[in-house]
Amino acid sequence: SDWPSNINHGDDFTSTLNQAIINDEHIPNTRLTACDSPSIRSGTDILLFPHNIRLLSISMLDIPNLILFLKNEIPNPFKFKEIEKMIFLVCGHQKRDDRCGKCGPMVLSSVQETISNKRMSDQVEVFKSSHLGGHRFAGILVCYPSGNWYGRVNPSNVEKY
């Protein structure tokens, strides 16, 4: 991807949403990460965990209501789909850290190949993600809905995960 070194600085959707989350002290323990999952329609789709839903076609104009929803102050006002597959995120954020930029694509390819070989494509989706933290442990793999984080993943040990 061509994510800048810090996806949270700028005037795009991701930066604006992240700033709104940071500025609201009533949204604790929330992390915003970009991934290369394509949006189903126009706007931005948001994979929301642990809710296990994909919010569909969210725009800049939706951010105030999204913040209210994240704070549980309003019911979900957005179109959404249940996430029925496991989601694996592999950090491949080259501009943030070279280690993830080098390890990530190899791990991503190996995970995709393993899923295909095990005929699990109907159960798992794999995406490259922006910075997940802990780049000294690259390759980093995060699995949802379990929320398990794995570090130092490499093509030779992918099948363990």
Task: Please name every model-derived segment.
Residues 1-161:
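Histidine/cysteine-enriched polar flanking segments
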